[in-house]
Amino acid sequence: MYNHKVVEKKWQDYWAKHDTFKTGTDPKKKNYYALDMFPFPSGKGLHVGHPEGYTATDIVSRMKRAQGYNVLHPMGWDAFGLPTEQYALKTGEDPAVVTKNNIANFKRQLNKLGFSYDWDREITTSDPNYYKWTQWVFEQMYKKGLAYEAEVPVNWSPDLGTVVANEEVIDGKTERGGYPVYRRNMRQWMLKMTAYADRLLEDLDDLDWPEPVKEMQRNWIGRSVGAQVTFKIKDSDKTFDIFTTRPDTLFGCSYTVLAPENKLVQEITTDGHRDEVNAYIKKIESKSDLERTDLNKDKTGVFTGAYAINPVNGKEVPIWISDYVLASYGTGAVMAVPAHDDRDYAFAKKFDLPINQVLEGGDLSKAAFTEDGPHINSEFLNGLNIKDAKKKMVDWLEEHNCGEKKVNYKLRDWDFSRQRYWGEPIPVIHWEDGTTSLVPEDQLPLRLPHATDIKPSGTPESPLANLTDWVNVVDEMGRKGKRETNTMPNWAGSSWYYLRYVDPHNDKELADYDLLKQWLPVDLYIGGAEHAVRHLLYARFWHKVLYDLGVVPTKEPFQRLYNQGLILKNHEKMSKSKGNVVNPDEVIDEYGADSLRMYEMFMGPLDASIDWDDNGPASTKKFLDRVWRLFVNDLDLKAIPQERIVDKNDGELDKVYAETVKKVTEDFDALHFNTAISQMMVFINAAQKAKTIPREYVEGFVKLLAPVAPHMMEEIWQVFGHDESITYAKWPTYDPAKLVESTVEIMVQVNGKLRGKFEAAKDADRDDVQKQAMALPHVQKFLEGKDVKKVIVVPNKIVNIVAK
């Protein structure tokens, strides 16, 4: 009997002792970099959803090693961030200690699953030797003008005691914890991601990524081409700009709308409307951007009492304020053309504002007309379609100095400050004379000081502000200063970690350029789709900055990205609060790691979300036990059943073996693991029926199954007399000629009716085929007493006998 507990421990110990998965450095071999999205080491440990993506990269890594590649397959820990800090606050423990314990537990679980990580390259984002380089990247951005301080409207979460980035707000609530988010102005460190908007957009086309992820990034960047138009304010020398993608409809503008935060609002509001305007601003000040836009079904707003002048026709249009206009998007002001925009139409109907039609078509009593058509009521644009009218209007605006062609982005600069303790300190000093300087590079890392009170202050300062010995500094000239007390977001360390794996112990630079050249871009990156517009966008941005600095040799970090689906329990995402978490430790204990790995790959397509079946690992264990019994003598566990497994090949399994090698190799490359496993089951079924199995085919099959079930296959490999690990045993190949059937089935008809069939050699001689057909007893029965007039032989298919 196969004992998974004994065998799995034996091989895990062997791999660790022999450094089996140390990254290869043979210059004659090609390199392959297989990367998992590294986990946040929570106190809960792994659940069975985690190993799905990890098993996939492990299978590919193991196959690539056997195919003769140098393989880099590392693992590390995304250790800074809110969850650890929240837990530490609740329990009173030190977040550094919590992190250390959680990592130890995660690592234990990963090793029990038999993953082939090169642990010499392990990294932790909260390790000062690591975040020294996170701080170094920040300093380079600061020097290039890409990191700057600004007073900006932010997403403030009182419950978390910190600001969260736009990318971390989901449906108006924080991604972590689901707490409400409020808008307030605060001094923040920002990273100028908008400077890279075009490149982030354009370079998506060169990536082998799932189309939905690329589309999400395109939408998040939100590039739109239009015009900026300047409106004058009536009876004033003040003006404001609006951005519009439809400059062709300017003649139809019947009102304008400013963001309530727009500084002009207080200056232009008339006395008669001031109370109403101020009350409205108060009412909406806590709403998040999302609540004000996408979630905002019922448009609200108030009139300021002021009017603007439409530059194209000199007509007065009222100036309103409404929360659906954001100060942070475009110019914080819009022109409204209710006849040809659904949102403007709803607003105009609600507040009884004019609707001026400037394109022919539709029924404006029912809805806005948003399609193409000839322009009307538009003077020099009349008769033109949208495309031509846009161009002509932009030309007119530029000629009259009241507008220009403009590209706008939905993407905002990255809000990079957090008012929390457990994060990378920002290496900046604010001096009493109002200047700011970086901590000198040779003094990095700026270490996070130990603190006992890490409770958020509820102010724009982090708990670090309480550590006066750390905060207060004096330079050699006696000038006093204070360290920056905000910390970096947990996305900072994960924006470049894949680079550090290439050269993890380098204390002179982030990573050696020549080594990066050998390994980048990452060949395969597997992780959840939920990171589409956070981690994956941030990492691309940092990578492009580092490319411009000459630190990395490629424009993009990850060539091929694949999103694994979720493993659900009772059709819901696994979570502790729902009580539906399946612990892999228990599954491994009962069925073994190989059975768990195989079940997760056999459940269905890797990118599908599938419900966990408690009986699943039992069924894959059953299959693996069949493999074991077929290849290993059950009475003597160190011997092969010699009567079944032989050196001679009778050809019976040629075709199914060739099919299996071909399909498994192709399917592993395509990440179609479920169909690869199905094919291996087909082979085992055929092998069980065969009188004998060629030893060459058994060993080839064991190599194919080893990436999925490495522990059992190592053991079988040893039983077959091999001293070395199966890890670097050459990947099997097949003879394409054996994929072709050597025999064919021939149908025999007598006078058009099927009377028999037989096997013949493919492309056999016609006379031989005819003789075999005539010799069939059942055929002879129908020919008795008749003259054969004609015999038609269709090669490899049919023999038709005409008899009278």
Curated annotation (Swiss-Prot):
A motif ('KMSKS' region) lies at residues 573-577. One of its GO terms (molecular function) is leucine-tRNA ligase activity. PROSITE patterns: AA_TRNA_LIGASE_I. Its EC number is 6.1.1.4. It is an enzyme of class 6 (ligase). It catalyses: tRNA(Leu) + L-leucine + ATP = L-leucyl-tRNA(Leu) + AMP + diphosphate. GO terms for biological process: leucyl-tRNA aminoacylation. Its main location: cytoplasm. ATP binds at residue 576. Keywords: Aminoacyl-tRNA synthetase, ATP-binding, Cytoplasm, Ligase, Nucleotide-binding, Protein biosynthesis. SUPFAM superfamilies: Anticodon-binding domain of a subclass of class I aminoacyl-tRNA synthetases, Nucleotidylyl transferase, ValRS/IleRS/LeuRS editing domain. A motif ('HIGH' region) lies at residues 39-50. The keyword Mitochondrion does not apply. InterPro entries: aa-tRNA-synth_I_CS, aa-tRNA-synth_Ia, Leu-tRNA-ligase, Leu_tRNA-synth_edit, M/V/L/I-tRNA-synth_anticd-bd, Methionyl/Leucyl_tRNA_Synth, Rossmann-like_a/b/a_fold, tRNAsynth_Ia_anticodon-bd. One of its GO terms (cellular component) is cytosol. It is found in: Cytoplasm. Belongs to the class-I aminoacyl-tRNA synthetase family. This is Leucine--tRNA ligase. The gene is leuS.
